[in-house]
């Protein structure tokens, strides 16, 4: 079964799934901090100002630029800031392949919180990762995401489509 995303031909922007928006808890961001240079400029391309990425990284003294499709900033069309040190976020699951493709094209260090299931599933994906330098970091427990920042408890095992 082919799982690569079908692209919207008119816009050249990958189509998103309505279940793509899950929010990351702080405990999934904190392990990244030790790998970042102090006072870095970080672009969070899938994040609103309420994002845990924005809040945690800013609180650690980093300059953070957040952009989000809902406020008109499309990651696939947005001009990458020249002086950005890192690109960090939790991308929409249904377009993660296209996100990684663009990140490799941009050529800046990045950290994307994604599940590894299906990451290398197709030959196209496998080749893309094989042709680029990247590292993986695994957590010692499964991440429980929020569907709404107002939720008291994270949603366990969110659906991925």
Task: Please tell me what each predicted stretch does.
Residues 1-161:
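Class I S-adenosyl-L-methionine-dependent methyltransferase catalytic core
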């Amino acid at each position: 079964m082919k799982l690569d995303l079908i692209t919207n031909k008119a816009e050249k922007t990958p189509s998103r799934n309505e279940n793509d928006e899950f929010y990351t808890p702080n405990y999934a961001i904190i392990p990244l901090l030790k790998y970042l240079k102090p006072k870095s400029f970080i672009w969070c391309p899938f994040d609103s100002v309420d994002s845990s990425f924005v809040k945690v990284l800013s609180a650690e003294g980093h300059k953070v630029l957040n952009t989000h499709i809902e406020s008109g900033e499309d990651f696939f069309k947005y001009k990458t800031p020249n002086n950005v040190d890192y690109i960090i976020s939790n991308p929409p699951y249904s377009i993660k392949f296209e996100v990684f493709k663009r990140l490799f094209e941009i050529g800046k260090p990045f950290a994307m919180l994604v599940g590894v299931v299906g990451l290398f599933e197709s030959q196209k994906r496998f080749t893309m990762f094989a042709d680029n330098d990247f590292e993986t970091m695994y957590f010692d427990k499964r991440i429980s995401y929020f569907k709404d920042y107002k939720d008291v408890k994270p949603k366990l095992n969110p659906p991925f489509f």
